[in-house]
């Protein structure tokens, strides 16, 4: 009869639907709440029929979800300091100076760090469950661990944080740009014939010459020429 065939059709449809329903364990970041959520979803295709919280999270899956979040959001999610960014730039300068040959300096560019999060960050994500917890991560230690001995010592020799100038001052180098910038009062360089170099003489620094009141006077990578031309002309 028509009713029995309709009922049979309904049963068949339910059976087909039941076969298509699958349970999916979903572990992802709740953007609105800023927390990690784990749930079991009953789905047909991409349609979610129901959700229920998952307890007893698998640690590796949990850490992978956090790594995926950092990869999606970028390294800015981590507690960088200006000092750590300077350290990263110093390492990368020495690596770039080795262009064309195998470098002993690891690739610590943002792209390389994002690609290797499982290696250097994932082992330390055990206590992260909220966005605010990222601020507690000691990423300085994690990244410094990527520099094997004796490279930390060589880093200080080849890409020093400070340069000694004739006045006796120890002036900080800024590695946030390439070439690194040495902002120094002109008077402190009296007696220095040419531009300071680092990295075993391979890298000339960029001098931002300042007045006694620390106002910009000149930007140069050729101090010898500055003494001969600009400075000599100004003295006339």
Go through each PLM region and give its residues.
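Short, well-ordered junction/capping motifs at the entry into regular secondary structure
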Residues: 1-2
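Acidic, serine/threonine- and proline-rich low-complexity intrinsically disordered segments
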Residues: 5-162, 202-236
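Short, glycine-/Ser/Thr-/acidic-enriched flexible segments
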Residues: 9, 170, 178-179, 187-189, ...
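Amphipathic alpha-helical packing elements
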Residues: 154-186
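Short, surface-exposed, low-complexity cationic segments
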Residues: 175-205, 209
């Amino acid at each position: 009869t028509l009713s029995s065939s309709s009922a049979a059709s309904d049963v068949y449809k339910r059976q087909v639907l039941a076969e298509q329903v699958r349970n999916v364990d979903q572990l992802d970041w709740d953007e609105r709440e800023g927390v990690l959520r784990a749930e079991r979803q009953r789905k047909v295709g991409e349609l979610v029929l129901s959700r229920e919280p998952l307890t007893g999270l698998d640690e590796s899956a949990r850490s992978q979800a956090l790594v995926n979040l950092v990869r999606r959001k970028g390294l800015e999610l981590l507690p960088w300091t200006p000092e750590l960014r300077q350290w990263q730039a110093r390492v990368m300068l020495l690596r770039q100076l080795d262009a064309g040959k195998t470098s002993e300096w690891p690739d610590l560019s943002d792209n390389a760090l994002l690609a290797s999060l499982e290696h250097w960050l994932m082992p330390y994500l055990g206590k992260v469950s909220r966005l605010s917890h990222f601020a507690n991560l000691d990423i300085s230690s994690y990244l410094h661990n990527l520099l094997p001995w004796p490279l930390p010592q060589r880093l200080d020799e080849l890409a020093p944080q400070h340069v000694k100038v004739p006045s006796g001052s120890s002036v900080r180098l800024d590695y946030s740009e390439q070439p690194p910038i040495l902002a120094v009062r002109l008077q402190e360089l009296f007696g220095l014939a040419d531009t300071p170099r680092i990295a075993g003489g391979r890298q000339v620094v960029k001098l931002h010459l300042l007045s006694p009141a620390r106002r910009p006077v000149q930007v140069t990578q050729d101090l010898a020429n500055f003494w001969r031309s600009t400075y000599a002309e100004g003295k006339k």
